[in-house]
């Protein structure tokens, strides 16, 4: 290697690598969260909120930094009449805890009852869906699980098409306050 090429290589070797130390620090944070985060998330410690889709309680998700797991989300919905309607890339598993009803997925009607598992497939362009409670005297209740691992690769987005009839708030306010 000639002199100028060797000098350039030496300069490059002396350049400060800021990415690797950042990666190490982020991995340390993730490991610490896994070691010290909550293993049991208690329902009584998890508040109910009304959002554009339903009455919801978030057990864990990326924004909740006190849990041991950060690769998934788990949330419970209570649906009195029907949920809001929205579209996202799918990849959601919903276990029906109580009640009965149906879900419309891309225009197709699918009945369900307590003990059933609803699967929203991963689809290019997303999956439009809305959940309906069949019993006006008793709300339906279910637990949803979704993995975060693929989101960045799918260009994940959520498009709200219709709000729940129980939503009376301001979307902008709920984003600012988390309520």
Where are these regions (language model features)?
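Short acidic-glycine-tyrosine-enriched beta hairpin
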Residues: 107-126
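A short hydrophobic beta-strand segment most commonly corresponding to one strand
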Residues: 119-120, 129, 135-156
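A short, N-terminal "cap"/entry segment at the start of jelly-roll beta-barrel domains
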Residues: 1-69, 155-179
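Intrinsically disordered, low-complexity regulatory regions enriched in Ser/Pro/Gly/Thr
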Residues: 69, 87, 95-97, 111-112, ...
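Short histidine-centered beta-strand/loop micro-motifs
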Residues: 63-64, 82-88, 111, 130-133
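Short, conserved beta-strand element in jelly-roll/cupin
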Residues: 74-79, 87-103, 145-147
